[in-house]
């Protein structure tokens, strides 16, 4: 769309022939602009907000406490189950250890049969107390 069609002046020779249109304020002027701080009088009071937040916090902490009780009970149940089966597991391990120890003593007797004065199964450290072997030779085959 051309300027000539917009202003209804076809065939203008110069821009100076165009009628002068200038933006200005509406008749009577613009409405006053309020630039002061606006503090609303509606909505909950500070005390109401404080009480609501405090109540929500208290309810949340109550829920955390209930969750802690449940988690503690589940943990105790797990430990009780482990304490219950521990003697059975220990008995199985002791049985396995004894059979492996017998095999170890037989192997030691076979290897050291030519050494004079060697006593099979005797502790070489002479500490006076029994300790399980720490060298790993009596570990299960899966290890």
Swiss-Prot record:
This is NADH dehydrogenase [ubiquinone] 1 alpha subcomplex subunit 13-A. It comes from Arabidopsis thaliana (Mouse-ear cress). Accessory subunit of the mitochondrial membrane respiratory chain NADH dehydrogenase (Complex I), that is believed not to be involved in catalysis. Complex I functions in the transfer of electrons from NADH to the respiratory chain. The immediate electron acceptor for the enzyme is believed to be ubiquinone. It comes from the Eukaryota. It is a single-pass membrane protein. It is found in: Mitochondrion inner membrane. Keywords: Electron transport, Membrane, Mitochondrion, Mitochondrion inner membrane, Respiratory chain, Transmembrane, Transmembrane helix, Transport. Its main location: mitochondrion. The chain crosses the membrane at residues 43-65. GO terms for biological process: embryo development ending in seed dormancy; photorespiration. Belongs to the complex I NDUFA13 subunit family. Complex I is composed of at least 49 different subunits. GO terms for cellular component: extracellular region; mitochondrial inner membrane; mitochondrial membrane; mitochondrion; respiratory chain complex I.
């Amino acid at each position: 769309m051309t300027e000539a069609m917009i202003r209804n002046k076809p065939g203008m020779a110069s821009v100076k022939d165009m009628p002068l249109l200038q933006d200005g304020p509406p008749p009577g002027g613009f409405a006053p602009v309020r630039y002061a701080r606006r503090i609303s009088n509606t909505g909950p009071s500070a005390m109401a907000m404080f009480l609501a937040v405090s109540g929500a916090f208290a309810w949340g902490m109550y829920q955390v406490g209930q969750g802690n009780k449940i988690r503690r009970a589940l943990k105790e149940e797990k430990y009780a189950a482990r304490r219950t089966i521990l003697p059975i597991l220990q008995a199985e391990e002791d049985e396995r250890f004894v059979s492996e120890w017998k095999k170890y003593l037989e192997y030691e007797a076979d290897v050291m049969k030519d050494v004079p004065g060697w006593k099979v199964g005797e502790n070489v450290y002479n500490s006076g107390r029994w300790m399980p072997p720490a060298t790993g030779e009596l570990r299960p085959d899966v290890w």
